[in-house]
């Protein structure tokens, strides 16, 4: 084999020579090797929005680059017969372009389409940290819970710490001693209104918030930011969802039903929702028997169009028709103590017909100037037509049950012809800018308000043949009111606020500071109010599970139609005028709170506590009967509200959310030199919401709601507040519901068109407690008065079904 050795040496030398030559040639100027060209262009998505950090690669030449923030790229490449260029980005389909014998400068416009393949589902559960005064509530917490009113969002609010209600038929609520009218409600940054003439939960019907459309719920019981309007108790901020695919649901129960359907894509979404509610079955448990005909119908639509990253157009429309007809027959109520039971029997003639028809719409056009800055123009309109008419006659007997002694016999006649029309239009401009540490927002709103009312109501009573009040000479009605008023006014509102986040580096303490100011001017009373507000959230470095919160601010209750109605009474005949000298009610909020997050057996919990003090000034006193609030029409008193709210929230049962809250409160006001509690003085309240599953399966789900709250002060009607010497019994109620998941198709593994099917049965007022809503007062000829309680609904069974697709 030795003769082959010279040939191997020669071959090896030739290989080295070839390698050296190739290396030298590669170092020569490119003009000696091959021509080059420049490839440039832009990568966008289907909406022509730039895709940043997309990969542009030519693997044959080992060249790779990334697109800029504007989606642009540039590469210098070698010319060849064909050059293969790949464009790729996570979440998009990879695109390949082949360039044939490219020369000079080549420009490409590349559109990447969304990819079909998605990552596997990953669930990350963590309690949201609250560093401001607005807490975010889970929208699905009440989805399968038992309900009497059908207003799921408001019932969720009523179960929070610091919030109370004494009427399961109503969606209204009191917050830390405030009246029903002191709570602002926003839907997609537009303030919404309630009907004006509603006087009972039976009439109320459906609220403006449709739970099927809700994406996010923000709620604050005090110390809220400057962007929320001139109300001095609470702010409820609702955001409607933008579905990106087809979805819908159907629900039915003995109390009504709802339907929801939505179409969606990346650029366009359209949601439609219809609700129908009838409380005929529920009202049948009241002691007043008769023919109830409540029919409440509501339709809402939400359209959202995002043609590109720069523009967004939203429209919300709502039509609501709440109709309540009632022909009473008779009533029998037994009340008193074990030792002294009294019976109140009434036979009725007449009927009641009420109609509340509202329209609401908003149009928003938003322009984004990059990812950090936006400007939005929002136009909205609200209109309501309301009618409350009744002629009711009752012949009553009040007897002592043990002795059959007649305590009072008589007749009463109630008449009302109340009509109201209102229209509120507004135009709002909102500017927002975000940076690394700041979130700046400001806005200006112009409003036009027009309200007309025509009211005539009276009540006549006689006892044993004598008309009350009995003077012996003159004939008077016990109550009579006439009103014919019109309000036309302009209102301008402006605010500016900043959320500043700082600290947090190298395990330092983190701070969230929100500060702002709000201004409002009302043309009716020529008043200008200025409201500074500030809140601070602290996450200390020594314990990141702890959050401390402090807030202070001057809040005003800008007067609206109800507060303006100043009454004067002569010989039991009341006339109503609008008081142009009325001023805004004032409340100084001082709040200190904390959140502490911890785990028990691997399950997350959060303990929240808040101390608050509200100094109240320029108060307009009012009385409450059922849900009707009647104001004095003038600034006559000052007062305060102070208390503590505690809430424990967490997974009492793995995989479920439950909570229990405790509120203690003291309120006082000074009226005509006398100190007395506010009409909504609720000294204590306990709310609990608990969910559970059957052991070994998640098909069966139980929901339990408990409420225990102190009774409110009250006195005889048409009396001054100084006579509030009584307090109603405590409000106690338990509702329980059991749901069975007939179909679980969340992952779409089955061919069924439905995603979920739930069947449920509820027991409303589980313990059958007779809660007092208000009182009917009987007066005999000697002016002796008897308070007959008007009880709320009794125990009822409700069945329901929910289909989601």
Located regions from the model:
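Short acidic/polar hinge/loop motifs at secondary-structure boundaries
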Residues: 74-76, 191-219
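C-terminal beta-signal and adjacent terminal beta-strands/loops
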Residues: 655-658, 707-715, 740-805
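Transmembrane beta-barrel wall of Gram-negative outer-membrane proteins
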Residues: 249, 253-276, 289-329, 352-381
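Short, acidic, small-residue-rich periplasmic hinge/interaction motif at the N-terminus
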Residues: 42-46, 54-59, 86-93, 102-146, ...
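Surface-exposed extracellular loop regions of Gram-negative outer-membrane beta-barrel proteins
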Residues: 281, 329-330, 334, 541-590, ...
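Face-selective signature of the C-terminal outer-membrane beta-barrel domain
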Residues: 306-322, 351-525, 608-611, 659
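Membrane-embedded beta-barrel scaffold of Gram-negative outer-membrane proteins
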Residues: 374-380, 581-635, 640, 759-764, ...
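Gram-negative outer-membrane beta-barrel transporters
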Residues: 506-507, 612-615, 634-715
